[in-house]
């Protein structure tokens, strides 16, 4: 999987002043600290309508109407599969309540499977870079995967912000349910790194089949200042205060040598979570290499195939 971003702590005094004083606003702090959108690695093009329907009025984006779109990957996307696999990837754009149009992707890895992962990726990648990983993961754990780019990432319009992050996953949730008819009891929310923030927020408001938190953070301030012991009013991404409201089963995965989001964050989230299942603490793993350890796939398979209902 592509790297999910650089270190987020260990700032100099000058950097801290820039983060928290220009201006001292949580959303601006969050954007400076957490969002690193790469140069887009893909485009989404709407295909020409057949001659018989060419005179019909254009479809409104985000309306839930099926639209024929094609995915075009750049060389930076590092595509690893054949055209047959690429044909199993559907892309479209969906409007959020805050006015952004999100790039969305549905990967049919396992058509007969019960579960679909709603995957919120890390802070320094886009769908083009993640597409190959999604196909490999979904095939191995027998799940389809739905993902989306945050506002300001990939082909998604708007700018990255904490408020947009929550609106983005809300739109993705409704797109998955409306466009593909996937019901909540068949949706597994999967968040990685910064993607755990919208995942916890959504899971605290909607019940689903399960939640997977991969390298989660307690809050933005606790990443920048590891000695922080409580949530302040100006903190960003306060997942630690929301996790207690999650009523679905939660699997937490964290590397013990994570150099970006300390292992203590995963432990604290696990201890605060009312429906946590047996976690996966990957001994020696950092922030960007958990997927390389055999126990990663083993634990996911065990959780999805044996600990969740599959009838």
From Swiss-Prot:
**Listed InterPro entries:** AB_hydrolase_fold, Hydrolase_4
Give the active-site positions: 193, 258, 287
Answer yes or no on keyword Lipoprotein: yes
Q: Tell me which EC number(s) this protein carries.
A: 3.1.2.22
Q: How does it sit in the membrane?
A: Lipid-anchor
User: Which BP terms in the Gene Ontology apply to this protein?
Assistant: regulation of postsynapse organization
Q: Which residues form a coiled coil?
A: none
Range of residues in the leader sequence: none
Q: How is it modified after translation?
A: Palmitoylated on cysteine residues located in a cysteine cluster at the N-terminus which promotes membrane localization.
- Which stretches does the entry tag as region Disordered? 48-67
**Keywords noted in UniProt:** Cell membrane, Cell projection, Endosome, Hydrolase, Lipoprotein, Membrane, Palmitate, Postsynaptic cell membrane, Synapse
Task: Show the GO cellular component annotation of the record.
Answer: dendritic spine; endosome membrane; plasma membrane; postsynaptic density membrane; recycling endosome membrane
The catalytic activity, as recorded, is: S-hexadecanoyl-L-cysteinyl-[protein] + H2O = L-cysteinyl-[protein] + hexadecanoate + H(+)
For this chain, one GO molecular function annotation is: palmitoyl-(protein) hydrolase activity
On whether Zinc is a keyword of this UniProt record, the answer is: no
Query: In which compartments does the protein localize?
Result: Recycling endosome membrane; Cell projection, Dendritic spine; Postsynaptic density membrane
Any idea what job this protein has? Answer: Hydrolyzes fatty acids from S-acylated cysteine residues in proteins. Has depalmitoylating activity towards NRAS.
Q: Which family does it belong to?
A: Belongs to the AB hydrolase superfamily. ABHD17 family.
Q: What is this protein called?
A: Alpha/beta hydrolase domain-containing protein 17C
Query: Species name for this entry?
Result: Xenopus laevis (African clawed frog)
């Amino acid at each position: 999987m592509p790297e999910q971003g650089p270190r987020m702590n260990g700032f100099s005094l000058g950097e801290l002043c820039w983060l928290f004083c220009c201006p001292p606003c949580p959303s601006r702090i969050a954007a400076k600290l957490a969002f690193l959108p790469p140069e887009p690695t893909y485009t989404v093009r709407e295909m020409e309508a057949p001659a018989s329907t060419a005179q019909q009025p254009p479809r409104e984006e985000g309306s839930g109407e099926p639209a024929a779109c094609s995915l075009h990957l750049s060389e930076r996307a590092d595509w690893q599969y054949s055209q047959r696999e690429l044909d199993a990837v559907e892309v479209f754009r969906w409007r959020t309540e805050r006015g952004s149009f999100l790039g969305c992707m549905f990967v049919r890895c396992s058509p007969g499977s019960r579960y679909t992962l709603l995957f919120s990726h890390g802070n320094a990648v886009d769908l083009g870079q993640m597409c190959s990983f999604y196909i490999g993961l979904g095939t191995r754990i027998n799940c389809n995967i739905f993902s989306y780019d945050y506002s300001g990432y990939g082909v998604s319009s708007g700018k990255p912000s904490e408020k947009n992050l929550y609106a983005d996953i809300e739109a993705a949730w409704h797109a998955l349910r409306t466009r593909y008819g996937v019901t909540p009891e068949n949706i597994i929310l999967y968040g990685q790194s910064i993607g755990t923030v919208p995942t916890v927020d959504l899971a605290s408001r909607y019940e689903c089949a399960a939640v997977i938190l991969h390298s989660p953070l307690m809050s933005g301030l606790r990443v920048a200042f590891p000695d922080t012991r409580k949530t302040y009013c100006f903190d960003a991404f306060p997942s630690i205060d929301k996790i207690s409201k999650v009523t679905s089963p939660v699997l937490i995965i964290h590397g013990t040598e994570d150099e970006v989001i300390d292992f203590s964050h995963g432990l604290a989230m696990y201890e605060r979570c009312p429906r946590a299942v047996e976690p996966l603490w990957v001994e020696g793993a950092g922030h960007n290499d958990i997927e390389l350890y055999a126990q990663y796939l083993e634990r996911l398979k065990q959780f999805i195939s044996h600990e969740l209902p599959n009838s």
